[in-house]
Curated annotation (Swiss-Prot):
It catalyses: uridine(1939) in 23S rRNA + S-adenosyl-L-methionine = 5-methyluridine(1939) in 23S rRNA + S-adenosyl-L-homocysteine + H(+). NCBIfam families: PRK13168.1 (NF009639), rumA (TIGR00479). The lineage of its organism: Bacteria, Pseudomonadati, Pseudomonadota, Gammaproteobacteria, Enterobacterales. Residues 10-68 form the TRAM domain. This is 23S rRNA (uracil(1939)-C(5))-methyltransferase RlmD. PANTHER family: 23S RRNA (URACIL(1939)-C(5))-METHYLTRANSFERASE RLMD, RNA M5U METHYLTRANSFERASE. Its EC number is 2.1.1.190. GO terms for molecular function: 4 iron, 4 sulfur cluster binding; iron ion binding; RNA binding; rRNA (uridine-C5-)-methyltransferase activity.
């Protein structure tokens, strides 16, 4: 998620104002203006008049707390979650999905235009269901000795405190139904005071959980977890430390993409929103327009979410990743899916990839999917490879806009941009962009 504003605060004298909200920022905050300064107001929507209390004042902007709405806009809806406003997981359930997507898309277009100097008309937003989409979640666990009670939930807004969660409508239904029986199971463990967190993941072959415990579990607790797993049909993994995971019971997880089966480790990164991921991969394939005689490079490839589907179309695909475990997983999946034309390499992506032995033959197309920090150290090396097309998948519009400047300066054209509504009701803004080689760029 891009950070557009400094989080540092300055205490001010409380001042009450009546303002009209003009727009919604990508994080779901209403934006009003007073005396030439923007005011960000959580909970307020465009077109609404609101009575607010200023809580923070900076030179360029202020923040306000919503005290009272004087009218309600048509885009305001009733949040589906009883914890909304307290739980920090979602910020925008009070706005309908059309308004959320429009505000994020507008922010994306403005940012790219400002940083890169050009932005084509955005293609329609890639999206899925606004609820029931999350196939992965991590819940904190904390035992309260005075109440003799376990807390299980997400962090409160702007706090480290937990909100006890019994329902979470953004979770896939297969995971949400586990919340209550899971809480009851964990509350009954002898090790209840020494639990850290629990991760829930929905694989295509069923749900799994990873329990972080701080002491060795006794046999009675292991038996209780096995009973829970059998009763709820959940695979259970135990994490006695932050590095190692022990399978207690269940099948190895996998998910399917473009007709391929990708096995993954319970702690491997997989895209949270399966529906959007399927569309995202299909769009990347269409934009790259891979031909049977072409070589394709996939940077920041992970375990092969894009790499392996591309290998079904290209003569050869090379995936490069900085995490060794993901490289091993990609190699395993290439073998299991009978794709001998794909190779995975563990490399420092800040080094000059154009000088690597596997790059000497060059590449016709390049895809990259970096983390939030972007790919500043990689862009100049991509230019050296002179691919005909580059697809950049981004989870941070600020670094996408920054990195695109390198390609534009090298003669590439920003041909298409799409926003991905990967995380409805949150401030996360994901996108993808296609850059095409213009005539005169050497190959």
């Amino acid at each position: 998620m891009a950070q557009f504003y400094s989080p540092n605060r300055r205490v001010t004298t409380k001042q009450t104002l009546t303002v009209t909200v003009n727009s919604l920022d990508p994080f779901g905050q209403g934006v009003a203006h007073h005396q030439g300064k923007a005011i960000f107001i959580p909970g307020a929507l465009p077109g609404e008049q609101a009575e607010i209390e200023l809580t923070e004042q900076k030179r360029q902007y202020s923040r306000g707390k919503l005290k009272r709405l004087l009218n309600r806009c048509n885009e305001r809806v009733v949040p589906a979650c009883p914890h909304f406003g307290i739980c920090g997981g979602c910020q925008q359930q009070h706005a309908n999905s059309q308004l959320q997507q429009m505000s994020k898309a507008d922010s994306l277009q403005r940012l790219i235009m400002r940083e890169a100097g050009a932005c084509p008309q955005l293609d329609p937003v890639i999206c899925g269901s606004e609820y029931g989409y999350r196939r992965r979640a991590r819940l904190g666990l904390l035992y309260q000795p005075k109440q003799h009670r376990l807390q299980m939930g997400f962090r409160q807004t702007e706090s480290h405190d937990l909100v006890c969660i019994k329902h979470c409508p953004v979770l896939r239904p297969e995971l949400e139904r586990l919340l209550l029986p899971l809480y009851q199971c964990l509350s009954g463990l002898q090790a209840v005071r020494r639990l850290g967190h629990v991760e829930l993941v929905l694989a295509d072959n069923g749900p799994l959980m990873v329990l972080r415990h701080l002491d060795t579990l006794k046999e009675v607790d292991r038996a209780a977890l096995i009973d829970f797993a059998k009763r709820e049909q959940v695979a259970v993994y135990l994490a006695g430390d932050s590095d190692n995971v022990e399978k207690l019971i269940g099948e190895e997880p996998y998910y399917q993409i473009e007709g391929l089966r990708l096995a993954f480790h319970p702690r491997d990164f997989i895209q949270v929103n399966d529906t959007v991921n399927q569309q995202m991969v299909a769009q990347a394939i269409a934009w790259l327009d891979v031909q049977p005689d072409e070589r394709v490079l996939d940077l920041f490839c992970g375990m092969g979410n894009f790499t392996l589907p591309l290998a079904k179309l290209a003569r050869e695909v090379v995936g490069v990743e900085g995490v060794a475990a993901l490289v091993a997983n990609g190699q395993y999946n290439a073998l299991n899916n009978a794709l001998p034309n794909v190779s995975f390499f563990h490399e420092n992506l800040e080094s000059d990839i154009s000088r690597q032995p596997w790059a000497t033959q060059g590449f016709d197309k390049v895809l990259l999917d970096p983390a939030r920090a972007g790919a500043a150290g990689v862009m100049s090396h991509i230019v050296k490879l002179a691919p005909k097309r580059v697809v950049y998948v981004s989870c941070n519009p600020t670094t996408l806009a920054r990195d695109s400047q390198v390609l534009l300066a090298a003669g590439y054209r920003l041909a298409q941009v799409r926003m991905l509504d990967m995380f409805p009701h949150t401030g996360h803004l994901e996108s993808m962009a296609l850059f095409m080689q213009e005539p005169g760029v050497a190959k």
